[in-house]
Structure formats: C-alpha cells, structure tokens
C-alpha cells in the first residue's frame, strides 16, 4: 500500500521533474527522512517536505527539533545551499517558502525553527496566504506555481 507520504512526495517530485529543467535529486535521508537536495544548472537547493493531510484550507505545519537540527546540518555540510520548505497542503498543492520567507513569520523569541508553527490557507483560484506565530501574516502571497520555480 502506498503511504500518504509516498503519494504526496511523489506528486511534488512529478511537478519538479516536469518543470523542464535538467536536475539531480538526492535523498539526504542521513540528515532527515523528508530532506532532499535538488541540483540544477543555477543552484543547489535543500528542501524539507512537510505534509498536512487536512483536506481543506487552512493547513498547519509545526517544525520539530529534529527538523531544526536537520536544517542546520544541511546548511553546515553544504555551504552554498539555499533552503526551502515545501509545504504539501494535502491534494491542494505545494506552498514553497524560502528560508527568508519563513523567518518573516516565525516568532523571533523562539529558537530558530523548533516549535515554530505556520498556517497556510488558500481560497479557490488564488495564491497561498501564510500566517506565523502571533498571527503574523507574510506580506506577499505565495503563487501556486512557486513550486518548483523557486528551487531550480
């Protein structure tokens, strides 16, 4: 039986592969089971896949201590890597955020990623809205086509 994680990761990879760029995908499972590196002709991206199986908007995501450690390990091992979170919102789509975008909505009083919660919502035919701690809203919306455009 195919797990939700396999199904949803597979959908994300299909969009990435069909984007048209020549890429290499490496599963860095030694760092974290949901961490991947994507190498294109222009950059190297580290991507943490996070999944919400909630059927409708809004989708919640919380970063664990293990994910925080994995992000730090990835950045220490690969100096020039760009980090992204691919927030898979069940079957709706993928809200792709850069590290800088994440930091704009994170609670600055908390450790870097550990315990940070964000909420992603989307109305029909619109972009994703991202809210962080204390209802801090990201200034700009995230277009549905940000995945995989941002990472390649």
Feature locations, PLM:
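Catalytic cores of nucleic-acid endonucleases
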Residues: 53-94
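A short, compositionally biased
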Residues: 30-33, 80-81, 123-124
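Ordered hydrophobic segments in well-structured contexts
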Residues: 37, 45-50, 84-88, 93-101, ...
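Acidic-basic catalytic patches of nuclease active cores, encompassing PD-(D/E)XK
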Residues: 1-34, 38-43
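Exposed alpha-helical structural elements
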Residues: 8-12, 69-73, 101, 146
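Non-catalytic C-terminal interaction segments of nucleic acid-processing enzymes
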Residues: 99-152
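Conserved catalytic cores of phosphodiester-cleaving nucleases, focusing on short active-site segments
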Residues: 29-65
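Structural alpha-beta junctions
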Residues: 14-21, 78-81, 107-114
């Amino acid at each position: 039986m195919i797990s939700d994680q396999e199904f949803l990761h597979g959908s994300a990879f299909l969009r990435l592969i069909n984007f048209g760029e020549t890429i290499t995908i490496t599963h860095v499972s030694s760092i974290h089971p949901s961490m991947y590196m994507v190498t294109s002709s222009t950059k190297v991206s580290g991507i943490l896949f996070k999944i919400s199986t909630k059927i409708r908007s809004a989708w919640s995501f919380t970063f664990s201590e293990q994910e925080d450690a994995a992000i730090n390990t990835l950045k220490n091992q690969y100096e020039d890597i760009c980090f992204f979170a691919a927030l898979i919102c069940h079957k709706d789509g993928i809200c792709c955020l850069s590290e800088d975008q994440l930091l704009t909505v994170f609670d600055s009083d908390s450790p870097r990623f550990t315990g940070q919660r964000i909420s992603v919502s989307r109305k029909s035919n619109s972009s994703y809205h991202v809210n962080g701690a204390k209802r801090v809203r990201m200034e700009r919306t995230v277009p549905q086509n940000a995945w995989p455009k941002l990472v390649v």
